[in-house]
Amino acid sequence: MAQEEKERIVIPDENGDEHLFDELFKFTVDETGKSYILLTPVGEEEGEEEEAEVFAFRFEDREGEENDIALFPIETDEEWDMVEEMLNTFSEE
């Protein structure tokens, strides 16, 4: 069975160095209309004893820019709890 091609995102750090991430999944919360994305660093494979590092962001599509999104930090405990619940559900599948 062929492995599904993952979306990749480049995120620059505070020094301007670019880091490549694989998209784990995206979801939108109907009640708030906010969208979230979960990413893992490229090249970091999940081992038997070690879990892959997962980064979560709120995102918005940039108007007029195809395949371009703006990432925002998750700021509230309620958002973190919801993202964690979604990740746990995704991990169980």
Swiss-Prot record:
Disulfide bonds: none
Pfam short name (any one): DUF1292
InterPro entries cross-referenced by the UniProt entry: UPF0473
Family: Belongs to the UPF0473 family.
Alphabetized PANTHER family for the sequence: UPF0473 PROTEIN CBO2561/CLC_2432, UPF0473 PROTEIN CBO2561_CLC_2432
UniProt name for this protein: UPF0473 protein BH1270
Organism of provenance: Halalkalibacterium halodurans (strain ATCC BAA-125 / DSM 18197 / FERM 7344 / JCM 9153 / C-125) (Bacillus halodurans)
